[in-house]
Amino acid sequence: MCIRDSGLSLATLLYTLNFFIAAGILRVHYLTLVLVLSLFIYINELFLQNNRPFHNIAYTFLGLIYIALPFSLLPYFVMTVSGDVSGPVPIEGSEDILNYLLQPEHLIRFSPMLLLGFFIIHWIYDTGAYLSGRWFGKRKLFRRISPKKTWEGVLGGSLLAVMTAVLLSRWFHQTGMITWVMIALLIIFFGTLGDLTESMLKRKIGVKDSGKLLPGHGGFLDRFDGILLSVPVVFTWLQFMMR
């Protein structure tokens, strides 16, 4: 098995484990399987007598941490387990069907509102930053990495993102306004860093698009570069807030 296939298998395992952990079916210690498989991939690559084994290992685990890990955390945004359920649970809607199929003895609360709100804030910030930078942009944010991004764009996108967070707190009452605004601030800061990181990677490699999908728009990864850093940070912050 080549290291690319091994990396894809590891990414699939990471997402699958996090999905079932978020659903309350598996415990967190099952994530140690990822460490065991990572060690196997590391040793296997060293003994394959490739010309650049450490480069291959580094790129594989960079992809795992940079791309696979953020996407594997998304199930935690939509599923929470609320303890044991005594007696049969009536099946009435899609959420009840999910409870019954995944784990009948636990009540799994399935709500896409937090994840939907996260993406809405991210998209509003991205769009607002682009339009503000195009209309009013003068001061470059980081000319060496991304010459088109400006401070005016960041400011315009930030204002729209915070306003969106306030509106979301009125529509999605389960999450308070302070939480939504904090999520928006984390998206603004780490989303911008994620955007700059992806731009820097493309410049170092010497490519215009990150993939063959969506040519001319920076590639498929450009549509998600902002969330790659913001998802782990928002997830971590929410975990501390819920304790």
Predicted regions and their residues:
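A general structural signal for short secondary-structure boundary/capping elements
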Residues: 165, 233-235
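Juxtamembrane boundary at the C-terminal end of a transmembrane helix
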Residues: 236-243
